[in-house]
Swiss-Prot record:
The keyword Ribosomal protein applies. It is found in: Plastid, Chloroplast. This is Large ribosomal subunit protein uL29c. Its main location: plastid. CDD domains: Ribosomal_L29_HIP. SUPFAM superfamilies: Ribosomal protein L29 (L29p) (SSF46561). Keywords: Chloroplast, Plastid, Ribonucleoprotein, Ribosomal protein. The keyword Ribosomal protein applies.
Amino acid sequence: MSLPAFTEISSFSNTEISVAIIETENQLFNLRFKKATRQSFKSHEIKNAKRRLAQLKTLLSLRLENLDQKDDNLINTLITN
């Protein structure tokens, strides 16, 4: 699995990001389980899953932060008017 660039992930909707986070967490769990039970797996897939999970969570937190800033700006304009 090749990792998509952050710019490609940023075009996802919030719902798609949430679904991708859940899928990636499940994939990471399965890879860790395979490692613990000494089944065959590709070790680089753990690194890729962690990186993808970090990218998705970062994007989601950035969007939430932007929403908070917009709400704060709206509240400030309402207070001053």
